[in-house]
Amino acid sequence: MKQIYLFLWAAIGVVLLSTGCSSTSAIPDGEQLYTGMKPTEYVDADKSEHATSVREELDVVLATKPNGSLFGSPTLQSPLKIGLWIWNAFSQGTTSFDKWMVKAFGTQPVLMSYANPDLHTTVGRNLLKKRGYFNGDISYSLVPQKNPKKMKLQYAVRMGQLWTIDTLDYVGFTPGQDSLISAHADEAMTRSGAPFDISTLESERQRITQLFRDNGYFYYEKGMASYLADSVSRPGTVAVNLQLLDSIDGRALRTWTIRNINVNLRRSLFEKIDTTSHGRSLRVHYNGTHSPLRRRVLSNQIKLKRGDLYSASLQEETQQRLNATGIFSQTRLSFVPIDSTEQCSQLDVVADCVFDKPYDFFIEAYGKGKTSGKFGPELIMGLTKRNAFRGGELLNFRVNGAFEWTWGRSDNQESSGMSSYEYGGEVSLQLPRLLIPFRGTAKQRHEKARRRIQEAIARGEDPATVRRRRKVYYETPMTTLRASTSVINRKA
């Protein structure tokens, strides 16, 4: 078999040498092989951060990799273009061997028609306009090579004047929305004097949308406001208006508050619900005599509260925290107006949660060997119980055992064949909360916070200054309790 491969590669080498390792012999008439780009020339480009960012984007837009590109570069090529040589040597053949060689080892040439510099310059000009260079232009030139069948490209970019934002006004919004925009003006993504940049303006529109949706505007969407730009009044600058559309559903112009929060707990997707447990903040619906999950656990994970304004960020956090418990196979939040009148401004929240399978079981088997001549098997078994005590806990059991014996002769003949063994077990309980000693109950902590606020009011201080900032966790805090034992008996 080795001799066959050597013969095959020797035959390929002879063919390549006989054809002179040509990279253009099979190029069709009227076509030229694209051999890369010369570095792009940037005319009148400044060194600002914005201009540097635009240049980096243009380098990507204008780039076309030639055959044998080094590290994906459009300007550097490897001197050994074996795939291209094989394609030129065998692509015009009609035998099965020729077709196999082209398919297995050949690389199709990159032609000038594929490089298509006209298309790249058009895309580049559009990019310049989107990034504020309205007068920018891009041209290219063909750079002939010694072989008339080969051609290089070189682009020239004239960026021109950078247009900036003269004013950015928010037009047509309601007084409540205007107040929100003014209160968060320091968070704006762009402002007067900044470069005119479509991507930055789009980020600002997205920020306004998120701001509204975090402050009760449940039905507001990004497409309900659009930009109007005036680049004529003051040359070199653009007056921009973010304007609310005229025909908008009235529900998007008022704030919505949370009323009832309903949680549907199912062990399977189509399980029927026949029991409801009412609480101060939650209504839990389930099947059976008692809830499969304690109310306190749900209250900790659901950050939307009765009487609060709707918040898209809290909705997303609630969804993430429910998923992070590890006890649900799927969760879904939905919001329903309490009635269909035009004055309605309250939403009922429905959280549909389907429990994952209650048990997981695994078994692992290994075979071990040591340089001392000892060999033997090892077995590990584990069982996990989800929601073990109706508090979202994960209860894990794990047992392991291993046995080994000595094979062959050893210096101590009496120990040859004698066995060693090991066995043990582990129990762990993972709680979806932090256990902090001496912290006190939630009722005690709330009472302590209430007294601090009352004392601040008595001193004439702003109560907001003594309120502690709410902790934000990117994952549900976990406490793990673990106990394990192991017995090892080793014999020399």
PLM regions and their residue ranges:
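Bacterial N-terminal signal peptides that target proteins for export
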Residues: 1-8
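C-terminal motif of bacterial Sec signal peptides marking the signal peptidase cleavage site
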Residues: 17-20
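Interaction-mediating elements
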Residues: 22-324, 333
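Gram-negative/organellar outer-membrane beta-barrel architecture
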Residues: 180, 291-292, 311-492
